[in-house]
């Protein structure tokens, strides 16, 4: 049986660094909620069996009417960290018939620049891989190490062989679930799915990502994201 594809969007964060009282995934960019662009990209990929959005149990900002016409499901099972939210979402995918051998693509809600083309490029590159992998970009900037709390450069770090991780991150549901459970048992709260897979002793692959697929994090990021998204909206 051919493994199926599922998408998982952890959306339980508060976006504290974005400088807004409204979680960043619900901020309006180019006429739509930021989250809309992420959901629309996966909705355009009809090969996915389901897209599951994981919300915080007490989320009062989500309004399904803002995403009318898009195919996705919502479960209010978010945890206290990204890792916990992803784990709960993986467990929730079983409700939609997902098995351990099916693929899941975990994507940050705050990366609205994702495109169906990039999603399909990742799937095509990894669908026969025994582990899976992520989209990422080679580090282009010079890296400086600065001690915590300071502002003086301690040294320059080599950027050779360094890649900046993005999402989606694509792994078998069972492998990712077991890797996260192991990390939790051993007291590690990891910031992305590939880290959990690495912790379990596997070697994920990298697939070339895109500059437009950046994570909206700080207040100044919204203007850049809006410019990119507005251009795409006008082009369509």
Curated annotation (Swiss-Prot):
InterPro entries: IspD, IspD/TarI, IspD/TarI_cytidylyltransf_bact, ISPD_synthase_CS, Nucleotide-diphossugar_trans. It catalyses: 2-C-methyl-D-erythritol 4-phosphate + CTP + H(+) = 4-CDP-2-C-methyl-D-erythritol + diphosphate. Its EC number is 2.7.7.60. It comes from the Bacteria. Belongs to the IspD/TarI cytidylyltransferase family. IspD subfamily. Catalyzes the formation of 4-diphosphocytidyl-2-C-methyl-D-erythritol from CTP and 2-C-methyl-D-erythritol 4-phosphate (MEP). This is 2-C-methyl-D-erythritol 4-phosphate cytidylyltransferase. It comes from Burkholderia ambifaria (strain ATCC BAA-244 / DSM 16087 / CCUG 44356 / LMG 19182 / AMMD) (Burkholderia cepacia (strain AMMD)).
């Amino acid at each position: 049986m051919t493994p199926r594809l599922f998408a998982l969007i952890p959306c339980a964060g508060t976006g504290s660094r974005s400088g807004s009282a409204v979680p960043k995934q619900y901020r309006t960019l180019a006429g739509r909620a930021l989250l809309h662009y992420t959901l629309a990209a996966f909705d355009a990929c009809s090969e996915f069996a389901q897209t599951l959005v994981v919300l915080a149990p007490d989320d009062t900002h989500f309004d399904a009417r803002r995403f009318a016409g898009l195919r996705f499901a919502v479960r209010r099972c978010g945890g206290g960290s990204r890792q916990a939210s992803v784990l709960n979402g993986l467990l929730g995918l079983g409700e939609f018939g997902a098995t351990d051998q099916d693929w899941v693509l975990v994507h940050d809600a705050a990366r609205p620049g994702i495109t169906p083309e990039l999603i399909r490029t990742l799937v095509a590159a990894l669908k026969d891989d025994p582990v899976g992998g992520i989209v990422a970009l080679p580090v282009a900037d010079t890296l400086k190490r600065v001690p915590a709390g300071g502002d003086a450069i301690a040294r320059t770090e080599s950027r050779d062989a360094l890649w900046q991780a993005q999402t989606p991150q694509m792994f078998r549901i069972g492998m990712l679930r077991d890797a996260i459970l192991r990390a939790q048992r051993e007291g590690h709260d990891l910031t992305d799915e590939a880290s959990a897979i690495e912790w379990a002793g596997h070697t994920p692959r990298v697939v070339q990502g895109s500059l437009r697929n950046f994570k909206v994090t700080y207040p100044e990021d919204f203007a850049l994201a809006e410019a990119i998204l507005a251009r795409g909206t006008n082009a369509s």
